[in-house]
Regions:
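Cap/insert and terminal regions of metallo-dependent hydrolase folds
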Residues: 137-223
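Active-site metal-binding motif and surrounding structural segment of the metallo-beta-lactamase
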Residues: 43-94, 151-157
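Pre-Walker A (Motif I) flank of P-loop NTPase domains
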Residues: 225-231, 236
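Short, conserved loop/helix-junction motifs that constitute active-site signature segments
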Residues: 61-65, 82-86, 148-153, 171-180, ...
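A short, acidic, amphipathic alpha-helical segment used as a generic capping/interface helix at domain edges
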Residues: 137-140, 145-146, 164-176, 243-250, ...
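Core dinuclear metal-dependent hydrolase active-site scaffold
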Residues: 1-61, 94-149, 212-225
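Conserved P-loop
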Residues: 9, 235-299
Length: 405
């Protein structure tokens, strides 16, 4: 099955006319995108883009052989240009199947938002799933085939990856997307980050995007985004490090969020911060409040998000009496070193996908107290040792993630 992406952008395209935002200002060349439309084997057209005949011609294709045009957008969506010579576009009712003279079988997929998704099966059995912007499949309740998703994993999925990362998480949870599925981001709007940051965020989700006019063959080998198993995200206070860490896992199901800060009775500010974090996280994530990280790292299971090492270190230093100079000299330093070594070894040996958050505190004002300087030094050492065990290390500054490794 051969796909030509006549457009990969949102319905309004990218850049949007007269929009001064950074994404629109930098959407030039390959980053400029028309409304998403996909030509399948020259015979099936999924959605319409402005000037589809011209878009196809620029890609070295023709729409003269199109036998079916399917619309996925909501009925009250933007008006579409309908060129002469094409079959009248239709929407297939949810759950209905359609056989096309070209040999393709099409099934309409019910969604959790207005619009229609389409599962397309070629004569040789290759399967793709196409979803409209802002939508996820409805009824994905568990892994394996069922009436809502027969046939096992898809060979290719095209969806709004950054707009609905939970849609990709649901598909992964149901076994409809696996490591062999080619995940393509489409419907890209001006709320996506500009330039290389877009491709970095997509790679972290196990997805990619291609320029308008690209032709792909379903099942062909391609460079699958390398998903790091262990990632350390560093940053200062309010730098956006936790948001970045959450973003790296929001397209994966059943994440366990490990909060090392615990509860602080009577601290309204702390309670507000915790509530904000919980609101931001996907509803499918679970939360554990603990500083006992080694058993979690040693166990098999879904991805872990550990937030954060600085609070873990505070608790560890409390337990060994590190704030008192005499206790520190009388075995406290050695006890802390042993606990740090145990944690670092657990990060090295963990079978799980792990994203670890930590503060970067060594670049600011020198702490006024000996205990403050001790904490700064120990956190710097801890960050260095954990970074040494991670495939990917990021530094977040002003909400921008800089790749260190």
């Amino acid at each position: 099955m051969e796909l030509t992406l006549l457009g990969t952008g949102a319905p309004e395209g990218l850049p949007r006319p007269d929009c001064p935002c950074a994404s629109c200002a930098t959407a030039v060349g390959d980053e400029a995108r028309a409304a998403t439309a996909v030509l399948v084997d020259g015979a099936l057209l999924l959605d319409l883009t402005p000037g589809p005949a011209f878009a196809a011609a620029r890609a070295g294709r023709s729409i003269a052989g199109v036998r079916q045009v399917l619309l996925s957008h909501p009925h009250d969506g933007p008006a579409v240009e309908f060129p002469a010579g094409l079959p009248a576009p239709v929407r297939v009712p949810d759950g209905r199947e359609l056989a096309v003279i070209s040999g393709h079988r099409i099934r309409a997929v019910a969604l959790d938002a207005p619009g229609t998704g389409y599962e397309v099966t070629a004569a040789d059995g290759e399967r793709l799933l196409y979803l409209p912007p802002g939508a996820a499949p409805a009824g994905l309740n568990g892994p394996g085939p069922g009436p809502d998703r027969p046939g096992g994993p898809y060979d290719m999925v095209l969806l709004d990856v950054l707009g609905r990362p939970d849609a990709l998480a649901r598909l992964r949870s149901a076994g409809a997307v696996t490591a062999t599925t080619d995940v393509l981001a489409v419907h890209l709007d001006h709320d996506v980050p500009p330039g290389r940051e877009l491709h970095r965020q997509l790679a972290a989700a196990g997805a990619r995007t291609v320029p308008d006019g690209t032709t792909l063959v379903v099942g062909d080998y391609h460079a699958v985004p390398d998903l790091p198993r262990r990632t350390l995200v560093l940053g200062g206070a309010r730098s956006g490090k936790s948001v970045e860490a959450e973003r790296r896992l929001e397209s994966f199901p059943d994440v366990l969020y490990v909060a090392t800060g615990g509860t602080r009775p009577g601290d309204a500010d702390w309670a507000a911060r915790v509530a904000l974090h919980r609101e931001r996280r996907p509803g499918s994530w679970r939360t554990a409040e603990t500083t006992d990280l080694v058993p979690l790292l040693a166990a098999e299971g879904p991805p872990l998000l550990l937030d954060c090492l600085s609070l873990w270190l505070t608790d560890a230093m409390d337990s060994v009496g590190a704030w008192d100079d005499e206790s520190w000299a009388d075995g406290g330093a050695d006890a802390l070193a042993a606990r740090v070594a145990e944690l670092v070894a657990a990060v090295r040996a963990t079978p799980r996908t792990v994203v670890v958050v930590s503060n970067e505190v060594g670049s600011g004002v020198v702490p006024a107290t000996a205990s403050g300087r001790r904490f700064r030094d120990e956190l710097g050492r801890l960050n260095t040792m954990v970074a040494g065990e991670c495939e990917h290390v990021l530094l977040v500054v002003a909400g921008q993630a800089l790749t260190l490794r």
